[in-house]
């Protein structure tokens, strides 16, 4: 755990999700999110959007929307926290022995400006939805594996001794943006993610799979 929050009170650590994740990123549902996190951490990309405002005047990190429930007091505070987070992410990637990643979703919301993937739809936790700026995407097998493959190649380059353990989330979707039953969308999503994981397993000898979905 790279972000333990030892510099703040125990109460704030609990409310701010410190020590919950290996780094304080919240839920990363898609390989595209994981890839863009890596790219930002290592200077390969600079997101067009830095902060979203809330109705209470606080600010939300668009890429970690629920990591700080009380919100940030200013954009500067948010960016200071994000830079510390990215430093922790780099430390994690470079020093971990086994990196476990659960593939969770194929549905996501994406910026039309720079292709950024968000952890939740704009307007749900912060910001506001504008169809000219954001769009829904439901990733295919090809798109899912492409992002996963790009991340794995980059990760292995900086930490060649590390292993990767992939899983597919067993949790079914509770809602879908597709105009169909959520049962159908769940089956599609799990199928895509499972195939992408198998493709990675077959390509990289240092990648393994744990059958959490199957169990």
Residue ranges and their predicted role:
Residues 1-215:
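Extracellular glycan-modifying ectodomains
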């Amino acid at each position: 755990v790279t972000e333990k929050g030892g510099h703040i009170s125990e109460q704030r650590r609990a409310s701010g999700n410190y020590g919950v994740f290996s780094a304080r990123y919240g839920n990363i549902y898609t390989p595209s999110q994981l890839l863009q996190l890596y790219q930002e951490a290592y200077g390969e990309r600079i997101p067009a959007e830095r902060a979203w405002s809330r109705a209470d005047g606080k600010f939300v990190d668009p890429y970690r929307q629920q990591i700080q429930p009380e919100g940030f007091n200013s954009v500067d505070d948010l960016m200071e926290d994000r830079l510390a987070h990215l430093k922790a992410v780099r430390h994690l990637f470079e020093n971990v022995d086994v990196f476990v990643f659960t593939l969770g979703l194929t549905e996501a919301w994406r910026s039309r400006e720079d292709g950024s993937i968000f952890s939740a739809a704009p307007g749900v936790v912060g910001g506001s939805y504008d169809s000219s700026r954001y769009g829904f995407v439901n990733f295919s097998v090809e798109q899912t594996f492409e992002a996963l493959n790009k991340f794995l190649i980059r990760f292995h380059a900086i930490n060649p001794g590390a292993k990767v353990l992939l899983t597919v989330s067993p949790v079914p979707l509770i809602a879908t943006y597709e105009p169909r039953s959520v049962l159908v969308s769940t089956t599609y999503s799990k199928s895509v993610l499972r195939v992408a994981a198998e493709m990675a397993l077959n390509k990289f000898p240092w990648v393994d799979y744990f059958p959490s979905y199957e169990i």
